[in-house]
Swiss-Prot record:
Residues 1-55, 365-390 are annotated as: Disordered. This is Mitochondrial genome required protein 1. It holds the Pfam family Mgr1. It comes from Scheffersomyces stipitis (strain ATCC 58785 / CBS 6054 / NBRC 10063 / NRRL Y-11545) (Yeast). It comes from the Eukaryota. Keywords: Membrane, Mitochondrion, Mitochondrion inner membrane, Transmembrane, Transmembrane helix. The chain crosses the membrane at residues 88-104, 136-152. Belongs to the MGR1 family. GO terms for cellular component: mitochondrial inner membrane. Component of the mitochondrial inner membrane i-AAA protease complex.
Amino acid sequence: MGVYIPPPNDNDSDKDKKKNKNNDNPNLNPEPSGDSKKVNNVIKGVSSTSPPGTTTYYIPNPSTWIPHNPSAGLIWGPLTPSSDNRPALYGMVGLQFILGLGFFRAARQLYRPRTIVTSVNSIPQHFTPKGSFWKASIPALTGAVAIYGCGLELSRLMLAYDPWYEEAKYYRRVAIKNGDKPSAWFGAYDYYKPMSTKAWIDKVGIWIKATEHELSEKQEVLDVSIVQANSSNPDDKGHVEHVLIPVKKNNLMSQMNKKGKYVEIYNRLRESNKSRYRTLLDTDLKDVQELNKAERIDLILEGKSPYSNPEYTKPHIQLGNHHVDTDDEFEMVWLNFEPWDELKLETDYDIRLIPHWRWADSDNSEPELDAVEQQHNHSISEAESSKELV
């Protein structure tokens, strides 16, 4: 019994031609997986004259292996640690300072005069001329540059806001999130290109101007509050003495360091809010409970509540010929006059910028403080409702 072999089909020849074309075209070959997918990390070496079926080699870019961490005054080049590794930066600054002192010592050894002893009883002793000034100037200049760079780097580390620090810290988190383990010394240097020195100077300059303006506004508010405090305390004869207490003003750098970063600001606001909650719950809102809610509402309606504000004026809304007897009429009047906009014009807002995400160490919240915050929010809502009823 014979075996039937079908004749060649035209479609098979077309498939072979397409396959050969795909092998000839290097752009249609799949890219390798792994570290070669990183941006600017590999150089693809493909020859257009390579025959089909050959292996394509991917040569890594050697420049991506060298860290390029920025610094303000360090001279260590590729050995410079990441900007978010502060202990390593302080250590390199100290090492550079010691190196600068070593260069100064070498310059002193080259330039100081030397004695020549001709005989044992030769008095006075003879001194050789001083060494070459140019030979001693080279290590002296090198030491001066090294120590000056230490000063610049320390000035950068003293800043409360460092764009290089924030950038390195962000990309280290990105690398950890992607499953990589960045170097503890160099950071995630293969994930980003640090910003230039000019961009860093511009960002720091903008931050310094904004912080200086904010501190000046706070100082003006403090001066006004001191004057008001003095005017509210008259003497025995009834005279009011307007005396401005001099406040010691520190330099701008120390005030910026006291201001701190956003995390410190957030923690400071949280602590101040907690103390205000406790003060309100211990004094004004001490008797505000759910058990005496009906009694408090009755006192508010009768105008005998201690929480009612007699100086509060309701927003002036002119209804004209409209009535609000039914729900439809009330909705029509509400949409027509927009009382929320009226209330918005008569309300002052105090806006504080806080981070929109939480740190890992702030996840553990105290249950007592949460209960205090809930009770305070409930009390505030009742106080606002009482104002509207009045």
